[in-house]
């Protein structure tokens, strides 16, 4: 019976469960080629010490491309094709994750997301 009650809650009120976690990106709208891009992701609803955060991007008319991630312990993994130009860091006390990308090229034109 408890399982049915839980299932009813999940089906009827999914927003009350999923709306707790939020990630919001902030940064410049446009950056010129050869310049650097810096984006901040502010999270709420979970602790950065216990969970990792990924960065992805989506060029116009294309699919998502994984850039890299930072784990709860602060270690990082990067897309090998972009590793030399990327840096991901975080400030646990401010619940913020930072993406920095250097030497931008026209191929870097995309929407950038944290997830």
UniProtKB/Swiss-Prot annotation:
GO cellular component: extracellular region; immunoglobulin complex
Name of the protein: Ig heavy chain V region PJ14
SMART domains in the cross-refs: IGv (SM00406)
PANTHER family with a match to the protein in the record: IMMUNOGLOBULIN HEAVY CHAIN (PTHR23266)
Molecular function in Gene Ontology: antigen binding
Native source species: Mus musculus
Signal peptide annotation: 1-19
Entry keyword Kinase: no
SUPFAM superfamilies registered for this protein in UniProt: Immunoglobulin
Keywords: Adaptive immunity, Immunity, Immunoglobulin, Signal
């Amino acid at each position: 019976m408890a399982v049915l009650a839980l299932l009813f809650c999940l089906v009827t009120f999914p927003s009350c469960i999923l709306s707790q976690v939020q990630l919001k990106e902030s940064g410049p709208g446009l950056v010129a080629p050869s310049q650097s891009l810096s984006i901040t992701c502010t999270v709420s609803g979970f602790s950065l010490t216990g969970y990792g955060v990924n960065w992805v991007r989506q060029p116009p008319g294309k699919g998502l491309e994984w850039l890299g991630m930072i784990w709860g312990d602060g270690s990082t993994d990067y897309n090998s094709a972009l590793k030399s130009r990327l840096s991901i860091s975080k400030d646990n006390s401010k619940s913020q994750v930072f993406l920095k990308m250097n030497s931008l090229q026209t191929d870097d034109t995309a929407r950038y997301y944290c997830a």
